[in-house]
Regions:
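A generic structural motif
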Residues: 1, 61-63, 142, 339, ...
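Structured secondary-structure scaffolds
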Residues: 1-223, 240-283, 287, 302-313, ...
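Acidic, turn-prone loop/beta-hairpin segments
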Residues: 30, 77, 222-252, 280-390, ...
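A broadly conserved sequence feature marking short terminus-proximal activation segments
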Residues: 35-45, 375, 383-427
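Short metal-binding segments enriched for Cys and/or His
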Residues: 175, 454-459
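Short metal-coordination and nucleic-acid-contact micro-motifs, chiefly zinc-binding Cys/His arrays
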Residues: 425-428, 442-445
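Cys/His-coordinated zinc-binding microdomains
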Residues: 433-436, 447-450
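Cys/His-rich zinc-coordinating "finger/knuckle" motifs
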Residues: 436-442, 453-456
Length: 460
């Protein structure tokens, strides 16, 4: 708005006429000798009828007498031979698209005008001036401008420079969804670059999103369930649902404001940071090793089901083909994902500050584990006994909770200001690979796995 306003404020007067042989004629008659323009509704009506039937070529010297009618002497008037500036033509597009009646679903004014950033002094402005002069307001409610695509080095693409990129070849190499992901990931308000390395980055993002859906499809295979009252769900699941509700609100806001860069960033970050690197990582033990009747496992899969239905809808405008593939894989007879409504997610809340503190401590623990893993003292966090500063632990988490959330053998609280890690002396369960006091020696089963195996054997 500011940019258009400043350009309108500083622009000179607009000369609408052009001396060209081809274009939209200025259908006026000028009185010889006085230069006075003829203003007669009946004359105008005859001109309009002729143009409507025969096009702009109807404005011809041979029809002067027909247009003027019996009330005027054709020899007293001259037909204007000038045409309208083509920018005036473009500025009238709102009239013949939104008011012609040919497309009843379209209404004036337009919801949105979309064009390149150069149109602030072009189409956006010509449309604004024409509409304000004839209708007293802008022909659009909103304007969205898009920057131009530049070569990877920031230069304008040019055949002479040999730096042009053929979208069809890019699609053959990367696929249409990766191009869409790239286009929606850039800041559309500015000029943006494209090249092999940039597209490879978009490809990496795409694979992470695709892997999220692949995990969800595998984890939900054969799932039929309902977690019931959210208050009965494990706290981690409540937290993830709260994150989903927060994401939903932010994505709605981004979509409503055409902030597609933020939309894709929020979606990718949620899948990578909150799901793959956090939630999925923590709950894989429950998914793979708990029994079919496990309350925690059922709660996890129920949340995964909610995540699936939300994420596939969120991804559909960005990854149109992948989202359709994902949806039809789980629901072969479920129609198209692109005909689904926006998801309705549970309005769940959680103490975000408390969980942020917990996740910060988790990062500290993972950083402290890494040197031991790199030096082959331990192979994973499951072999680590961890001591954390008591002051860094949020209220409400037991040591067992922390061990589960940090994916370690054990967690204890101490007076130190830093995280300390040692290799545990416990033995490793042969089924879940956790190192626990209940395992007598490596390869034996822990109490949980013994119960699960016994249940499965009994049901066989």
């Amino acid at each position: 708005r500011r940019r258009i306003g400043s350009m309108v404020e500083g622009r000179p007067d607009w000369v609408l006429s052009r001396q060209r042989a081809w274009g939209v004629p200025i259908t006026l008659f000028v009185k010889n000798g006085t230069g006075e323009y003829l203003q007669d509704p009946e004359v105008n009506a005859r001109v309009i009828a002729a143009v409507r039937e025969h096009g702009v070529d109807a404005w011809d010297e041979g029809r002067k007498a027909e247009f003027l009618g019996e009330a005027y002497n054709p020899d007293d008037y001259e037909m204007v031979a000038d045409i309208l500036d083509v920018w005036f033509d473009s500025g009238c597009t709102h009239a013949f698209t939104l008011e012609s009646g040919r497309w009843p679903a379209l209404q004036w004014p337009a919801d949105l005008y979309l064009e390149g950033s150069d149109q602030h002094r072009g189409w956006f402005q010509s449309s604004l001036l024409e509409s304000c002069a004839t209708r007293g307001r802008a022909p659009y409610d909103q304007v969205l401008t898009h920057g131009f695509t530049m070569a990877s080095d920031g230069r304008k693409m040019s055949k002479s420079l040999g730096n042009t990129i053929d979208p069809l070849k890019v699609m053959e190499q990367y696929g249409a969804d990766i191009i869409r992901l790239w286009a929606l990931s850039v800041d559309s308000t500015e000029d943006h670059r494209i090249g092999d390395e940039i597209l490879k980055g978009a490809g990496d993002q795409y694979r992470k999103l695709r892997n999220t859906f692949r995990y969800l499809l595998g984890a939900l295979d054969g799932f039929i369930g309902d977690m019931g009252d959210v208050g009965e769900v494990p706290e981690l699941e409540v937290y993830i649902l709260a994150l989903l509700a927060d994401l939903d609100g932010k994505l709605r806001h981004a979509a409503e404001n055409y902030d597609f860069n933020a939309y894709t960033r929020l979606l990718v970050d949620f899948c990578n940071e909150d799901l793959s690197a956090f939630y999925f990582d923590i709950r894989k033990d429950v998914l793979y090793c708990d029994g079919p009747g496990s309350v925690k496992r059922n709660a996890y899969r129920t949340v995964l089901d909610l995540l699936f239905h939300a994420l596939v809808r969120y991804a559909a405008p960005v990854l149109v083909f992948t989202a359709e593939e994902v949806w039809s894989t789980r629901y072969p007879d479920g129609g198209s994902v692109h005909l689904l409504e926006w998801p309705q997610v549970p309005g769940v809340t959680a103490d975000g500050a408390r969980w942020a503190q917990l996740r910060e401590l988790r990062e500290d623990v993972m950083e402290a584990i890494e040197p031991l893993r790199r030096d082959k003292v331990i192979r994973s966090g499951l072999e680590a006994d961890v001591a954390v500063p008591a002051s860094a632990v949020p209220e409400g988490f037991s040591d067992a909770d922390l061990a589960e959330l940090f994916i370690t053998a054990s967690v204890a609280r101490g007076d130190s200001d830093t995280v300390a890690v040692t290799r545990t002396d416990e033995s490793k369960c042969g089924r879940c690979w956790r190192l626990l006091p209940s395992v007598a020696e490596d390869g034996d089963l822990c109490d949980r796995c013994e119960d699960v195996v016994a249940t499965l054997d009994g049901a066989a």
